Amino acid sequence: TTITALRYKDGVILAADSRTTMGAYIANRVTDKLTQLTDNIWCCRSGSAADTQTVADLLKYYLSMYRIQFGHDPSVHTAATLASEMCYQNKNMLSAGLIVAGYDEKTGGDVYSIPLGGSLHKQPLAIGGSGSAFIYGFCDANFRENMTQEEAVEFLKNAVALAMERDGSSGGTIRMVILNKDGMERKFFAIDTANPIPVFTH
Amino acid sequence: MSSIGTGYDLGLFFSPDGRLFQAEYAYKAVENASTCIGIKCEDGVILALEKVVTSKLLKPRVNNRIGSVDRHIGIATTGFIPDGQHIVKRARDEATSWRDNYGSPIPGTVIADRLGNYVQLFTCYSSVRPFGVMSFVATYDSEGPHLYMVEPNGVYWGYNGAAAGKGRQVARNELEKLNFSSLKMKDAVKEAARILYATHDEENNKEHEIEMTWVGVETNGIHTPVPDELLQEAEAYARRIADGEEEDIAMQE
């Protein structure tokens, strides 16, 4: 898996590859690893599919209960804290690496990384999954804060594409979600389409 | 109270005319307790209560009945002191649990709701008795100032001005005269002192001490005791008013 999220000028963008494996077998080549938690908060999932789907479902439920009980939308920080608490308290049973990102009018866009142990890190750019190991250098060299939407989409597309080329557990297509004051927009990149995946190897 | 003496007040169950006597007795316990008031003003909340000094051996200003529950929450209780301490402890547990789960301060409306629900439980079981306290919850959060009063049966309402205890009637009359939407914290401290002095029992000249805390803009959103200097100034003001009123009454005679 390769998952990424970043803060850009107007909000946040999440991106992920689409490969799910069972050992060497590709169980799904068009997986959606970007999961909606609330209207304006999404997460990227990496690790065990069963574990992360369950954690995401529970998060979704708790956050909707929060809205019902307390009469306002939970902040991105609240969603991320809740996610990290669940991952931390159950660390012995879980294999889940999450990135929680969202946009709200009060704080703007925020990205939180929740790696394996359940710790919580607020970051301008977060990368995760097995594929991320191959793109730390690329991200260090090319990431800038306050990018335009076009720059940010291009950066994430290249980052995920590079990881997909080198990581055997990443591949398939690239999915993105853009969150800003105008709401949500999805992007999809695949070979032999109008929105192709960039190729770097020769 | 026709059902008294028929056994319906010996447990937490309804009498034939639909009353919970144990819950009603809890109110009686608070009615004779020391006066406690809360004022919600434009930029914060004031909690104030009056303590009868029962012994000269007691150290002044240390036996507090208003507790801090979180950075932005204060709770004053009047009635059974141990019950009040238990309520404050419970509120602290709720506040820390919220912080653990959501990584943010617990909203005022939520802490009041949680306490109300907790207190209500003690009107449901035969193995426990209801709390003999009124709890004043003062908070200041992103939504602004809040003041709630939780009653012994679990009911809680939001208030601009609230009073409980022996002098509640006098205090409520005085509170009704305040203009809460324009009142500032520093002025509210003076008003709180004045109101507590106005509730003083004339014949009963026991030693009294005023405990006062506040939370709001003036304190950067942190619940803390009103500084000694300001409290003394407010008490001096209250004493002057109290003396002045006495003169007015004398002149009318």
UniProtKB/Swiss-Prot annotation, chain B:
The keyword Nucleus applies. Keywords: Cytoplasm, Nucleus, Phosphoprotein, Proteasome. GO terms for biological process: proteasome-mediated ubiquitin-dependent protein catabolic process. Gene3D superfamilies: Glutamine Phosphoribosylpyrophosphate, subunit 1, domain 1 (3.60.20.10). It is found in: Cytoplasm; Nucleus. Coiled coil: none annotated. SMART domains: Proteasome_A_N. The modification Phosphoserine is found at residue 104. The proteasome is a multicatalytic proteinase complex which is characterized by its ability to cleave peptides with Arg, Phe, Tyr, Leu, and Glu adjacent to the leaving group at neutral or slightly basic pH. The proteasome has an ATP-dependent proteolytic activity. The 26S proteasome consists of a 20S proteasome core and two 19S regulatory subunits. The 20S proteasome core is composed of 28 subunits that are arranged in four stacked rings, resulting in a barrel-shaped structure. The two end rings are each formed by seven alpha subunits, and the two central rings are each formed by seven beta subunits. The catalytic chamber with the active sites is on the inside of the barrel. This is Probable proteasome subunit alpha type-7. It comes from Schizosaccharomyces pombe (strain 972 / ATCC 24843) (Fission yeast). The lineage of its organism: Eukaryota, Fungi, Dikarya, Ascomycota, Taphrinomycotina.
